[in-house]
Amino acid sequence: MPKQIDTILTNIGQLLTMESGGPRSGGSMQDLRVTEDAVIGISDGRIVFAGHQGAEEGYEARDIIDCGGRLVTPGLVDPHTHLVFGGSREKELNLKIQGMSYLDILAQGGGILSTVKDTKAASEEELIEKGLFHLGRMLSYGITTAEVKSGYGLDKDTELKQLTAAKKLGERQPVDLVTTFMGAHAIPPEYRNSPDEFLNRMLQLLPEIKEKGLAQFADIFTETGVFTVSQSRNYLKKASEAGFGLKIHADEIDPLGGAELAAELHAVSADHLVGASDEGIEKLAASGTIAVLLPGTTFYLGKHTYARAREMIDAGVRVSLATDFNPGSSPTENLQLIMSIAALHLKMTAEEIWHAVTVNAAYAIGKGEEAGQIKAGRAADIVIWEAPNYMYIPYHYGVNHVRRVIKNGKTVVSREGAALG
């Protein structure tokens, strides 16, 4: 007698399971292991089987989904966002086009301080409603797991408000969220001459954040004009002692030594890395710290020097990709677009890109054992794409290729019959 399960996805043209015993690096990022003419079984929100057609023998499902020969992959993972914020900054785009520098925009009350002001003014519920809108977009683009940072408060009340909003967002919509405390995102004007005092104030929040379960990671912006390597080391060591995983906004502009620090402290990830040194790249490879690259930020800022993804991969660094969704330097929820930018500007292959937005991205936020792979026993987080093969997604840029998103075994996005794009 056939075993009853909830759902069978059949007639899959190409299946990427992304099965891996850990984050991929070097040549293993080329090993995609495509299964053609495939099938997936789901029950109670979990994968029962995934493999070649015929694996469904002995099972009977209440729901059959015919994938029509299309591409099927794990849900995408976005390991770096700033999606809880107030306001927006569209007025700054024309100023940038006219040649106004960021410092000039900042002097006029724009830049990050504008977002800090708007985030302070917003209520917790307003931040949640705005976050729900952005997460709905992310889900529609195939993202089923994401990281979200605070950092637009720079004071106790607003940072806690952001983190609380993020926690509630995780409870009110399908995308799984991992939260990072980033109170050390910038130096407030009132602490310009006393950054150490500001960092100490942020460190004082850690016990309450931990007690309330508001964040899993702590992050700091290690960059010229923000926090030094020495300040960052002290801050992150204390965060680690308080029980937080570590992340670093490292070497976005200058080769300050953020990559080396991330490796030294065995941070889970080092993010940005546009200015990372050769030594920093070597140390990241040796430490296992994952490089989270944000090419959408470089693209949107109109810069021409991108992170050296090709050298990182060749050196053995575990590389992932993220949107860096934020209102100032990367206002997009579209990880598919980032995949195209990674191909064109980071010179990553399609195979490397798929690892970077699934399995490696999941490990970059501590979700490697739960997200980013289609594997028996794991949550059934799956995307059916309006695409014939995996190479098509980074190739055909600027549109949404999602046909259906399945989260924990349930369809949460269906664009079938719609004018896709």
From Swiss-Prot:
Question: EC number(s) for this protein?
Answer: 3.5.2.7
Q: How is the cofactor bound?
A: Binds 1 zinc or iron ion per subunit.
Note the CDD domains from the entry: Imidazolone-5PH (cd01296)
Give a GO cellular-component term.
Answer: cytoplasm
Pathway connected to this protein: Amino-acid degradation; L-histidine degradation into L-glutamate; N-formimidoyl-L-glutamate from L-histidine: step 3/3
Q: Where is the signal peptide?
A: none
Where along this sequence does the record place binding of Zn(2+)?
H80, H82, H249, D324
Q: Which cofactor does it need?
A: Zn(2+); Fe(3+)
Q: What is this protein called?
A: Imidazolonepropionase
Q: Which organism is it from?
A: Bacillus velezensis (strain DSM 23117 / BGSC 10A6 / LMG 26770 / FZB42)
